Amino acid sequence: PWLTSGKPINFELTMPQTVKYLYKQSGRKPDLDLWTKFVPVSGNLNVDEVDDIEKIWASTARKIGYSKNKLKKEIYPISSLYAIADHSRTLLFALADGALPSNSGGGYNLRSIYRRSMDFANKYNVKLDYSKLIELHAKELKPQYPELSKSVKSVQEILKAEERKYTQSKIVSKRIISKIIKTTVDENKLLELYDSKGITPEELSEASKGKIKVPSDFYLKVASRHEKR
């Protein structure tokens, strides 16, 4: 069990082969000394519970003896690998159970987490093979959920189709982004672009060289909008 293992990162115990694969494909590994100090105080960094997340990052970094920038530089890429692991496992369970990605309802959530995981992979140069991830998850889960192994091929096919749609959406997005960054973009516009075009605020921020800011609670607001529909 994680609590008695003495390790700071539970993903390394709950999905070891998947995480090992992601470390290899990204060329990154966690700084265990930093993570051992960070994990006990990381609960303060819930964006839905604080008014100024950057201030909390700074105070958290000071508490454990790091600069804010150094802490973020370590935490963001590694936590993105764990997000990819978590999202892909969720997709295996959901798709094996018969759900499908779509632009509405629960299917919207599945499409969103797939695309978020791909965005993380692209941002941090992870050489990601989603089919391999699905195989690793099914293998690790086989003792508890042997039925998942029977669905691996069908899940891989669904995700290959999603990858084609994702790639096409990025091509279209680039054309739209080049026009959008010349205009004023408020939070409502960011939400509209994400919902209708799949354009993330991170893409707009990067293209505008930081002029367009990413709201810290953006994805919470996206989820809230869809819960109300």
Model-based region annotation:
Residues P1-R229:
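A glycine- and charged-residue-rich anion-binding loop/surface
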